[in-house]
Amino acid sequence: MDIEIIRKTDPEIADAIEKELIRQRNKIELIASENFVSRAVMEAMGSPLTNKYAEGYPNKRYYGGCEYVDIAEELARERLKKLFGAEHANVQPHSGAQANMAAYFALIKPGDTVLGMDLAHGGHLTHGSKVNFSGQIYNFVSYGVREDTGYIDYDEVERVAKKHKPKLIVAGASAYPRIIDFKRFREIADKVGAYLMVDMAHIAGLVAAGLHPNPVPYADVVTTTTHKTLRGPRGGAILCKEEYAKAIDKALFPGTQGGPLMHIIAAKAVCFKEALTDEFKEYQKRIVENAKALANALMERGINLVSGGTDNHLMLLDLRNTGITGKELETRLDEVNITCNKNAIPFDPLGPNVTSGVRLGTPAVTTRGMKPEDMVEIADIIVNVIRDENYKEKAKERVANLLKKYPLYEDLI
């Protein structure tokens, strides 16, 4: 990108962009929902397609001059269907939350009962939190994980489903480190006559690479973000069976959105093309290898993890025996140039603004090229920061030495 063009018009924004790039280069990024896009994806986001209004769908627009953005959207849709083996795809959602909203609007009515994963147990705001539209428009009931194992309690899911008879069951999570049994969810949904929706936002890249079971054969509707493990632009997408295609498309436009962001849809198309390659599959394998290496190194050093490890790209540190809260550790790590987020753990005695846990993920560090031995180094730094308030300078030195080996966006600015 040419930062000087921006600087001539708006030096304050240019300065903010430049400093953010420096931050990304000089910190170890362990937020599980973040990643670094390819230059091709980034360039597509800054393309002239940003100028084009295109309400509607390809070949059914409410504006003229859409012949080339139609090509971009068709490519995105076809690539996404191929990636996950879906019958229908909608690539217009501006975010994962918008994708979820459209799915709800398509399948159920206000006031209907929905069964979703408890936010405190690893679910998402849009899975029924009372502070979110989902918990205000619909009657959500929740399931969670077993206190003794940290795994989803599928027997509880079935009991709650039989008791409340939901119209829709939502599977998927934002902080769950284990494989999700979509087949079991389908069986439970069928027993109570419910639709099954899967939110695979966090694991979409792993699913695309065959490293996590694919929800598409089991779910009526699947939603996702296009960033996170998929490594695309910030946005959402919806996959569904053909019988729900018309309802999904109508719920998205005109139901919940107006004009789509065509520059973002083009970037999604680029991302999906990248995800169809063998290189992407190998990259996803490295994400999981790094996650397991980081998790094992933390546990070997006495740190408890929710569920005792990970099957995917993320893990939850249970800090209750360390004398430090999630909020405190997030701050301490940020001070030594490691970025993460505090996160509630199941049955957390502390509030969501403090928490007894921290969530870590490996997509971004894997994108930089880091390997399992680097995860051991990162784990050792984290444990020393937890146990010694005076370790800050040594930790910063170790972080800087590690990052020197893995430059990021060297030619960007």
UniProtKB/Swiss-Prot annotation:
Primary localization: cytoplasm
Sites bearing N6-(pyridoxal phosphate)lysine, chain numbering: K228
Site (Plays an important role in substrate specificity): H227
Protein origin, superkingdom: Bacteria
Biological process annotations from GO: glycine biosynthetic process from serine; tetrahydrofolate interconversion
GO molecular-function term, one example from the UniProt record: glycine hydroxymethyltransferase activity
Protein's name in the database: Serine hydroxymethyltransferase
Native source species: Thermoanaerobacter pseudethanolicus (strain ATCC 33223 / 39E) (Clostridium thermohydrosulfuricum)
Species lineage: Bacteria, Bacillati, Bacillota, Clostridia, Thermoanaerobacterales
Protein encoded by which gene: glyA
